UniProtKB/Swiss-Prot annotation:
The modification Phosphoserine is found at residues 1222, 1390, 1393, 1417, 1450, 1486, 1516. Component of the THO subcomplex of the TREX complex which is thought to couple mRNA transcription, processing and nuclear export, and which specifically associates with spliced mRNA and not with unspliced pre-mRNA. Required for efficient export of polyadenylated RNA and spliced mRNA. The THOC1-THOC2-THOC3 core complex alone is sufficient to bind export factor NXF1-NXT1 and promote ATPase activity of DDX39B; in the complex THOC2 is the only component that directly interacts with DDX39B. GO terms for molecular function: mRNA binding. Residues 1218-1234, 1265-1285, 1294-1343, 1353-1383, 1449-1504, 1524-1552 have a biased composition (Basic and acidic residues). GO terms for cellular component: cytoplasm; nuclear speck; nucleus; THO complex part of transcription export complex. Residues 1251-1263 have a biased composition (Low complexity). A motif (Nuclear localization signal) lies at residues 923-928. Keywords: Coiled coil, Cytoplasm, mRNA processing, mRNA splicing, mRNA transport, Nucleus, Phosphoprotein, RNA-binding, Transport. This is THO complex subunit 2.
Amino acid sequence: MAAATVVLPVEWIKNWEKSGRGEFLHLCRILSENKNHDSSTYRDFQQALYELSYHVIKGNLKHEQASNVLNDISEFREDMPSILADVFCILDIETNCLEEKSKRDYFTQLVLACLYLVSDTVLKERLDPETLESLGLIKQSQQFNQKSVKIKTKLFYKQQKFNLLREENEGYAKLIAELGQDLSGNITSDLILENIKSLIGCFNLDPNRVLDVILEVFECRPEHDDFFISLLESYMSMCEPQTLCHILGFKFKFYQEPNGETPSSLYRVAAVLLQFNLIDLDDLYVHLLPADNCIMDEHKREIVEAKQIVRKLTMVVLSSEKIDEREKEKEKEEEKVEKPPDNQKLGLLEALLKIGDWQHAQNIMDQMPPYYAASHKLIALAICKLIHITIEPLYRRVGVPKGAKGSPVNALQNKRAPKQAESFEDLRRDVFNMFCYLGPHLSHDPILFAKVVRIGKSFMKEFQSDGSKQEDKEKTEVILSCLLSITDQVLLPSLSLMDCNACMSEELWGMFKTFPYQHRYRLYGQWKNETYNSHPLLVKVKAQTIDRAKYIMKRLTKENVKPSGRQIGKLSHSNPTILFDYILSQIQKYDNLITPVVDSLKYLTSLNYDVLAYCIIEALANPEKERMKHDDTTISSWLQSLASFCGAVFRKYPIDLAGLLQYVANQLKAGKSFDLLILKEVVQKMAGIEITEEMTMEQLEAMTGGEQLKAEGGYFGQIRNTKKSSQRLKDALLDHDLALPLCLLMAQQRNGVIFQEGGEKHLKLVGKLYDQCHDTLVQFGGFLASNLSTEDYIKRVPSIDVLCNEFHTPHDAAFFLSRPMYAHHISSKYDELKKSEKGSKQQHKVHKYITSCEMVMAPVHEAVVSLHVSKVWDDISPQFYATFWSLTMYDLAVPHTSYEREVNKLKVQMKAIDDNQEMPPNKKKKEKERCTALQDKLLEEEKKQMEHVQRVLQRLKLEKDNWLLAKSTKNETITKFLQLCIFPRCIFSAIDAVYCARFVELVHQQKTPNFSTLLCYDRVFSDIIYTVASCTENEASRYGRFLCCMLETVTRWHSDRATYEKECGNYPGFLTILRATGFDGGNKADQLDYENFRHVVHKWHYKLTKASVHCLETGEYTHIRNILIVLTKILPWYPKVLNLGQALERRVHKICQEEKEKRPDLYALAMGYFGQLKSRKSYMIPENEFHHKDPPPRNAAASVQNGPGGGPSSSAIGSASKSDESSTEETDKSRERSQCGVKAVNKASSATLKGNSSNGNSSSNSSKTVKENDKEKGKEKEKEKKEKTPATTPEARILGKDGKEKPKEERPNKDEKARETKERTPKSDKEKEKFKKEEKVKDEKFKTTVPNVESKSTQEKEREKEPSRERDIAKEMKSKENVKGGEKTPVSGSLKSPVPRSDIAEPEREQKRRKIDTHPSPSHSSTVKDSLIELKESSAKLYLNHTPPSLSKSKEREMDKKDLDKSRERSREREKKDEKDRKERKRDHSNNDREVPPDLTKRRKEENGTMGVSKHKSESPCESPYPNEKDKEKNKSKSSGKEKGGDSFKSEKMDKISSGGKKLFSLNLSSTHKSSDKHR
C-alpha cells in the first residue's frame, strides 16, 4: 500500500513501455482485491485512474496507451465503467474551469478512446451537456437541457389525477380496516404488509400517506408495539430512510401552535421508533421545539430570578409597610405562575424514560443545561421510576428492613430497557449515572430516597466487614467513591428541597454514621458551601431558610424556648447547614443567646446534630476571624462564646466528638493553643471537672477526697448526670486514639506558647494562653485518671522515662500523667495479694501494700535516674524523688471535715424533703433513697480513704531513712528538693500547692534524717521576688496557696509553745548548729527553742513584706498583679504584725491611686486586697507581742560566752564558723570591743533628741532641727543602699550541716561579736569626741581602700543608732498620740538617756554622713533590711544592759522634759556647726550620686524634676528597701507639704518597724539566692 498517498509515480510514466505499465497493472490488481466501496483501497483505485487520466490531459501519456491499459484493468472490477465515469466527470469540471484548449482537447480524445469501456447512458448521466455535444453523444446541448427539465417536472411536480370520491377513499378505508383488525391471532406483519401493497397498487394510494396512516393507527394501539415495529421495519425497506422521520417531524410541527399541546401518544410512538433505531434522534431533534438556545436562555433567566428573590429577602426592612409590600409581591408572584409552553423535547424525553430507553434519554439531557430536564417534575418522576425498576432486585435482597414487606415494582417488558441490578457492582452500570442526571430532584420521590439510603447502608456494612481479595477491595472502593458522589450531588441536595422530612433525615443518618467523620464533614462542607449555588431552586431555598432563621432568632427567649425550638427543628430537617451557620453567627455576637439556643435544639435529628458539630468546627476554623481582641491581650469574645456553646451542646445532646477533638489536636500540632479553650469547656461540661483558681478552702479540701466527695463538694456548680456524657467523651478519645496525643501535645505546647508564640504576642496574652494550656492539661488529665480503666490507662500511657526522653514531655506533666497509672497499678496489685490470703490481719495487709508498692515503683525508681544528671542523686535519692511525684493529697490526709459537711448537707436535704408537703410521695421516696445512697457512699469512701492513708504513712515511715543521702550539705539537699520537687509542683495545680506544703510537713513529722525543716522554710520565705515575677496569673494563685499552707503550719507552731514543743521540739528538722562557748571554734548541734523560733518567724514575715513592697514598687504589670494575687491568698496568715501590715497598706493604697486610670485590672486587684487587708487590721498585733525580746545578761562573761546579743540563743541558728578563723578577724574583734559601749550611749541620746525635736511642740529653733534630722534620714537611706553588698550582708550566712562555709560569709558574724563586745566598754564624753574624729579619718581611708571594712564600720554605726530610737518611740507613744498616724507600737521596758545629748549630736551626723558613701549592691537588695533590723535589735539589747530595769512613769516624764530643754539650748550651738558641715555633706552627696548606677540616676531625675534638694524624705525600711524607692517617696513628701510632722512620724515608723527581730541567728541567704536562681 505504498501508493496510498502518491498512487502513480512520475517515474512510471516516464518508463511506461519498459516498466511503468506493468507496475500500474500490478497496483490496480492489488487495489481491486477489496470490493467494498467504503474501504480506503477503493478510494486509492479511483485515485490511480484519476492520476492516469490526468497525465494524459497534461500530455505526458498518449491516450492510446491509456485506453489500452484501462481496457486491461476493466477485467479486475465489475464497477469499472461507473468508476471511470466518475473520473471523467471530475476531469470534465476541472478542464472546463481551467479553460486551457490543449487540455480540453486531450480530455476529449481520451473519452472518445474509452467509449467502448463506458456506456453512453452512464456518460449522459454524469457529464456536462456541452461535453456530451463535443463528444457527439447528443446533437444539441440546448435541446437536451429542455427535454430533461420536462421529464423532471413530469416526475416530481405533476400530481396524478385520481378519482378521490371512489377509488382512494375506499382504499384508505380498507387500509384502516386492515390495520385495525384483531392482531391476536396468527396474523403477522408480513401478511399485513402484502395486503397493504395490494391496496396501494389497487387504489393507487400514496405510499407516504399510507405510512402516515400506519403511524396514526400505531398511536391508537400502543399495546401492539412489536407488531407495528415489525410492520414499519418491513415497510421502510421499500422507502427512503428519511421519510419516516420527516412524517413524524411534520406531525410534531402541527402541534407547535401557541396553544397547541402535543399528545403523549405521539411522544410514545416517536420514543419507540427511536428505541428500535427506525429513526435517528439527530434527524428528529431538529423538528422539535423549543430550540436549544431558548432553553439556555430560560435557564439563565431562572438563575437571575432566584438571585433577585435572594436579594429581596436579604434587604433590610425598616417599616411595617414595607413588610406588607413584600407580602403582596409574594402573592403576585404566586398568581403569575402561568402554564408553561409545550416543550416537545421534554415530552419526548419523558416518553423515552417511560419505555426505558435510557441511552436516547441521556443524549437529549446532554443537550440541555445541568439538571434542567430533571427540574420538571414529570421528568424527575420518570427517572425515579426507571431507577425503581432498575434497583428492585438488589433492594429486595439487601435493603428491605426485617419484617417489612413492601410493594414490589414490576420490571419493564421491553428487552431494550436497562438491565436490573442484582449486586452492588451492577449499580455502576446505569443507576449511578441516572442519579447524576436526577440531581437534587430526587426530592420528588422520598420512597426512592429511602431505598437508595438503605442500599448504601448495606453496602457500607459489607464494605467495613469485607476481608476479600485485593481486586475485590479495589472494586468496592470504586463503588464507595460513587456512593459518596451520589450522596454529595443527589441525596443531600434532595433533602434540602424536601419539605422538612425528619424521617428522611434519620434514614440518611443510618448510612452517614457508617462513614468516617472525615467523609461526613467533607460532604457537609460541599453541601453548605457549594451545593446551594448549583441550582436556582436551591438558591431560593437558602434565602428562604436564612429569612426564616432570622425570624425565629429575633423572637427566641428563655420563655419561648419550646415553640421556638420546634420551629428550629422543623427548619433544620431540610437545611441544617444554613440554619446552624446563621445561629452560630448570632451566638458569636450575643452570648446571652447560648442558653436558650442550647435548650431549643432538642428537636433536632441525629444527622442535624452531626451537621451542627461540623458547623461549629468550621466556625472555629474561620480564617477571617481574629482570635484576639484589638488590644492583643485577651482572647476574642466570639471564641469564648463558641467554646461555652460547645461545652453546653455537646454535654446535652449525643453529638459525635471525634471531629472536634481531632481539630483541637491538629491546632496543637500547628502550634496554636487558642482552641484549647474549646476542649476545656467540653471537658468541664461533659465530665463535670472544673478548673478554677477561685476555689474555696472547703472545695479544695473536698478535692483531696474520693471521687464522690469531689463531685459533691469540690465544684461550684452541682455536677450531676455526667455519667453518659463523660462516657461519650471517653469513647470518642479511645476510639480515635486521641487521649495520650492530646495530653502530650498540651504538655509540649505549654513551652510552645512561650518560645514559639510568645515573641509575637503581648506578655499578658502569653500568660493567659499558658494558663489555659496548663489548666486544660490538668483538667484533661484528671478526666482520664477518673474515667479510664486501669488496663486502658496502662496500655496508653508509656513509662516516665519514655514520656520525658522520647516525647520530650516536661517532668511535672509526665508525672501528672503517670501518677494515676501508679495508683491504679498499686491498687490492683494490692487487691491481688489480698485475694491470695483472705482474712489476714491489718499488719499483713500493710505488708502486702508495701510489697505491691515496691513491685510497681521499683521500675520507676530506675527510670527516674535518667531524668537528671547523676550529681542530683548525691543530694536526694531516686526513691524520694519518685515518692514525692507519685503521691497526692488523697494519700497523705483524710478530709474528715469535708465528709462530715457533705453528710450533714444530705441530712438537711432529707429533712427538707420530709417537711415538703407539696412533693408527691413517689418522688419524695425516690429523693430520699437517692440521698441515703449518696450518704452511704460518702461514708464508705471516707472509711476506704482512712485505711489507704494509714497504709501510705506506714510505707513512708519505712522508706524515710533512705530518702535523703548524707553525701552533701543540708543546704544543697534542700536546694535540690526545692528545685526539682517543690517549686515545679506547687505551681502545677491548687491541690498540688497544698500537697507540697503538707509533704514538707510530713517529711518533718516523719523525723527524716538529713532534712532541715527550718532551712527549707527559710528558703521558701526568704526571697519570693524571683518566683513571683516569673509566674503566670494562675501560677501566682497556686504559689500563693502554697505559701498560705506553709504559713498556716508556721503560724500554728508560732502561736502556742506547747504545740511547738510537741511537733518541733525533738525533731531533727529544727536541729541547728551552735557556736561553741569560748573561742575554740568548735561547733555542736542543738534544738531551736520556742522564743528563737518566734524571732525566725518574724524575720520571715519581714522578708515577705520587703519582697511584696519591692514588687509593688517596680511598676511592672506582672510583678504587681502576681504579688497582689499572692498576698490575697496568704491573707489569712499574713500580715500578722501591725507595722508590717501598715507598710503594705500604704503601698497598696498608692497602687490604687496610680493604677486607677492606667490599668483598671490592677486597680481592681489592689482595691480588693486593700479592702480585705483593712478588714483584717483588727487581727494584727504589735511586734513585741509577735516575738518576745528578753533582756540579755549583764555580766561580760555571759556576753562573751553566749555571743553577741546576750542570750544563749543569739548564735543558735548562726552558721557554723570554720576552725581556722583568721588572726585579722580576731584583731578586729578585740579592737571593736573596746569602742562599742560608748557608741551605743551616744547613739541613744542622739536618737532621743531627734524624737523630742520632731514632736511639733518645740520652740522656733526646733524647725531647723527637724530639717537637720530629715537630712540625716536621707543620709541613712543612702547608707542602707550602700550596705547592700554581698560581703557585708549580715544575713549572708549558712545554716549548714557540717558548718562548712566561705570565710567571706563568716566575716559579718565575727564582726558582730566584736562590735557587741565593744559596746560594753563605757567612755567619757571627751574620749567620745576624740574617738569620733579618729573614726572619721579612718573612714575616709576605708572609703578609698577597703570597701568591705568601710561597709562593716557603717553597720556598726547603724547598730549604735537604734537603742535611742527605740526609747524615743516608747516615750513618745506614752506621752501622747501622734497627730498624723495615730498608730501605737508598744515596746517592752522604758528607756532613758543617761548621757547629755549635746556631746553626741555632732558625731551622730558625722556617722550618718559617712553612711552615705557606701556603695549599693542591687543584687542583694533583698537581704539588706534583715541585716539592719538584726543589727538594731542587738544594739538595743546591749543598751538595755546600761539602763535601769524599771523606772516609774512620772520619773520618765521628768527626765524627758529635762532632755527636751537641754536639746533646745544645744540646737542653737549646732546651727553654727551646720554651716561648716554642709559643704562636706554636699560633697559626699555628689560622690554618692556618682556611685549610683546611671539608669537609677536617670529615673531619679525623671521622677523628682527639680526637687533633688529634698533627698532626706523617706519612709521606714519596710517601705523602701530598694534604692529607687526613696526617690519615689520624695515627690510624695514634697506634694504633701507636711515636712515637719510628717517626716518625724516617718522616722518613728522606721524605728518601729526596724526594731523587731533580735540578731540571735542568721541563715545563709547568699546561698539561698544562688539556689533560687537555679531552681527558678
